[in-house]
Amino acid sequence: MTATERTLELLARNLQEVFGEGDMRRRRAAIEDFYTDDCVVVTPDGTYVGHDALNDFAGDLRATHPDYVYTHSGEPQVVQDAGIVAWGSGLKDEDPEYTGLDVLLVRDGKIATLYVFLNPTLS
């Protein structure tokens, strides 16, 4: 698998298998497979460093919206060791309640840094 293919795989699987996963053991296994040990995840709510912090954050986030699903909006894009994907989250078969953009940097085939941008909600 090329570096570009691995980055596309990470973009495709991260939302579902980390942030969309309700089972703690499966989520933790995905984190260990997808993220470097010293990973940094930067969100509007804070910065999380390492597998434990990411697992706790993703689990807490999932608990607030257990019935929401993540869907990709458009095609992921990759340039060298970086990738982006736009996404939405909400109830299945309904318009997303919120949307965002993930930007990730890959090192040695794993996500080293993830930046999560949330779009302003319209009301």
Give a label for each model feature.
Residues Q16, C39-V40, N119:
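A broad detector of the eukaryotic-type serine/threonine protein kinase catalytic domain
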Residues A3, D56, L61-S123:
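A beta-strand edge to alpha-helix "cap/lid" segment located at domain peripheries
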Residues V18, V41-P44, L91:
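A general structural-boundary detector
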Residues L8, R27-D81:
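A solvent-exposed, acidic/Ser-Thr-rich amphipathic alpha-helical stretch
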Residues T2-F34:
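Short acidic-aromatic low-complexity motifs
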